[in-house]
């Protein structure tokens, strides 16, 4: 296989890429991460994953580049990373005792080949009291996560169930990535 590059600064994505048990490099993409939430969100997040991969691929044309991005959607509102602690609290109140979708877009890019896709997982949250929300925000875990929670961290205790791929919620549907990388 050619050089493999992960175009992401996310420590969670690095953890998941490690599960492939294949050597890879990390080169952080400088792509603009804005999306137009008035468009089809799966298409938007797939396009963002493409932009991330393509930005890194331009200078690494001998490699296979994996780009990804994740959004949380509830009641047609896209929840990105919180701006501050108050924004994290607002998001957690929305998620509390509710169901939301997590969409992770992925692009695998090499010379002459593009595989751009997304995976969706439904997440069911338990009710969170104001005290629990404050305690969770005080842990600082929510501050760099889309939707203000980490399914693999302290946020796990608030999740009642999921429908779909757990790793999609973490930020990279690794089984799907592994399957698709076989054709590169």
Range-by-range predicted roles:
Residues 2-5, 39-184:
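Anionic-ligand binding patches
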Residues 2-22:
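N-terminal beta1-alpha1 ligand-phosphate binding loop
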Residues 8-10, 29, 96:
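Short linear Ser/Thr-Pro motifs
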Residues 11, 31, 113:
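Short, glycine/serine-rich, charged loops/turns that create anion-binding
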Residues 15-19, 36, 58-59:
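Short loop/helix-cap segments at secondary-structure boundaries that form the rim of catalytic
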Residues 22-23, 150:
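A generic short alpha-helical patch detector that favors 3-5-residue windows
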Residues 25-34:
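A short beta-strand-loop structural module common to alpha/beta enzyme folds
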């Amino acid at each position: 296989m050619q050089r493999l590059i992960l175009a992401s600064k996310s420590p969670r994505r690095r953890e998941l890429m490690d599960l492939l048990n294949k050597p890879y490099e990390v080169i952080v993409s400088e792509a603009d991460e804005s999306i137009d939430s008035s468009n089809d969100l799966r298409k938007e997040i797939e396009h963002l994953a493409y932009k991330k991969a393509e930005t890194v691929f331009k200078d690494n044309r001998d490699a296979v580049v994996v780009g990804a991005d994740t959004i949380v959607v509830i009641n047609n509102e896209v929840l990105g990373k919180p701006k501050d602690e108050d924004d994290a609290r607002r998001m957690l109140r929305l998620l509390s005792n509710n169901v939301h979708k997590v969409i992770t877009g992925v692009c695998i890019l090499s010379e002459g080949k593009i595989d751009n896709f997304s995976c969706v997982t439904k997440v069911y949250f338990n009710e969170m009291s104001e005290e629990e929300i404050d305690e969770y925000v005080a842990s600082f875990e929510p501050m760099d996560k889309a939707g203000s929670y980490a399914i693999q961290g302290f946020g796990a205790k608030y999740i009642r169930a999921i429908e779909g791929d757990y790793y999609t919620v973490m930020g990279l549907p690794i089984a799907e990535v592994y399957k698709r990388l076989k054709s590169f």
